[in-house]
Amino acid sequence: NDLESDFKEGGFLIKSVINYTTEPNLNTDLKLIEDLKSKLIDIIFVYSKRAADQLLKIILNHKIENNLDNCTLNCISINVANTLKRLRWKKIKIFSPGDEELSLL
């Protein structure tokens, strides 16, 4: 599903502009790892597929997937949640942008 290609095939003239780019943070705070291992984190918010990929990598690299059973995962979309679904979460919730506080209820 490439939207640009679909428009071009439909006869539209398209000019692509890259709004922004992101780079993964390669420096994981060791306090975060210790807090996850100690089950001190109750909720994690994930706002993008890329962030979900990074979180999955951190969890698997540090072998803390078994420490997530009392943590709730709040994701901005089902696509984001599906990336992390295979891990043991107490709960997975989907929220809308701006409604993060409502997902805490």
Regions found by a protein language model. Give the residues of each.
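Conserved beta-alpha
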Residues: 1-105
